[in-house]
Amino acid sequence: MTNTSLQIGDVYALQEKEIGKWFAFQIVQIGEENAVYIDLDYWSEMIPEENDLNKMSYLRLNHHLWNNETNQCWAPIKFFPSHAKKVGNMSIRPFEECKSFGNWPNGSQQKWTEKWKKLPKDQVLAFKEARTKWNETIIVAGKEVKKNIYGLFDDTLSAVKDFSEFDKLPGLGRITTTKDNPQLIPFLERRCLIRELVWDNCQRRELDLSRTHLEEVEISGEDIEVIILPSSISNLTLRGKLSPNLRIHSPNDGYFMVLRVELHDDFLPDVGLSRLTNLRLTSIQDFNLKDIPARYPGLTWLGLAGKPGYIREVSKISNLRELETLTMDDLFGFSADDFPHPGNLPELRHLWIESVPAEAGKIIKKLYKGKIQDFQVLKLRSVEWLHENLNNPLRNWDGSEFVPKSKYYKSVALWKETRRRMMEEASHAELDFSAVKRIAIDYAEGFNKLDRRSSFIETEEREDIFNAFEQILNETGLSEFKEEIIQLIDEKRSW
């Protein structure tokens, strides 16, 4: 139902949670279920008053890849923030047609605008210019690369003796590596617009990133015992086996930071970060939540995803009194009696549950219906379904609105037959690699046929198909051929 209190031209203010400053936005278009807002250039420690309206304009964004553009977005009227303060109403200015759909603003655009104003202007201008050089190339490390290249990988990183060679590439924003180079961290420290680092198999005991400008870091390596993060960090992802001694140091002790952990054998070390606000655990097989509230009492977001798997002591979530968002996917082993009641989570606004026990899901649905702002319970599973699909990498397609039921069953049958053939081939004393390639081609062509008449394979399904074959390679001990086989499937596919 439309919230009739919203009017075109209305200006509202909210307080950004990390820094605490106030920002403003204007309603410029209203539809049946959604409204368009535009961010304004107000950013202050003071709550705006009506006499501040004549000083406000549309916020022009120039951070990251923005180029003097306004940020307008369709957002659901039913989720309009109830704590927003109405400042007043002013005439709207001309704006471009809005094609973006998302959530109501949280002050991130104003915050990033202020941060980028403090960066070295020469690096920002060079970065912006480089990102426009779509067709120009340059020789770096003896290789021809595009001037607007955003990411570097091991092949290029290993080809230079001096990282100053990469000063020819001011548009860089991401480094992906599996090797340790003593020049890497100093390079990241002086390049303030390289915001992402992916480091697999890091073998350092201590990783000091405190003087870098990184926003997103993804790390794997069981030798790491200390990670020191910069003040710019927003997302840290840990993958693979972790040291029980691992400690993570952050200037804000994890406040307003996302910590993602892809669990290995369900082990989550106590890494510190006592003020962490956003925790997301994936690849859960059998995990107990008993320690989570004591370690991270200030969580506002908790995301839990199984492999699928079992989750224990779900009732402990009731101790997270500041929790605003809870997501659970592919998790079993709990009942409705274990699940927190609405009154136990006073700040909860968003509850997204998918692929959970059918009996528990039905009761949770009744408990929360009409009690919170944003709520969905999907793909309720029986015990029989879990037993049949525990190792099925395409199980998420079952019940998907984008994958027809018949296509799902045929896809699973194709995957199972591919797995059977690969297991048989891998059991031979001598591997016939030509036979392995034939199986991979049949796999790709099988999905070509399934997708031919009713195209259902999009980006997410495509990734699932590749991941499903990678699972077969891992199971059969043929993961060393992954790159070549995946490339072959990529060449033969039409989806």
Task: Report residues per predicted region.
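Amphipathic alpha-helical binding modules
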Residues: 379, 455-495
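Intrinsically disordered, low-complexity, charged/polar segments
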Residues: 47-124
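Short coil-to-beta transition motif at edge beta-strands of beta-rich domains
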Residues: 2-16
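C-terminal capping region of solenoid repeat domains
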Residues: 9, 339-451, 462-464
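Basic/aromatic-rich interaction segments and small domains that mediate binding to polyanionic partners
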Residues: 29-53
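Short beta-strand-centered aromatic/proline hotspots
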Residues: 20-31
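Mature N-terminal, pre-catalytic/accessory segment of carbohydrate-active enzymes
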Residues: 9-10, 42-45, 49, 128-136, ...
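Concave beta-strand-loop units of leucine-rich repeat
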Residues: 132-184, 189-206, 211-226, 230-362, ...
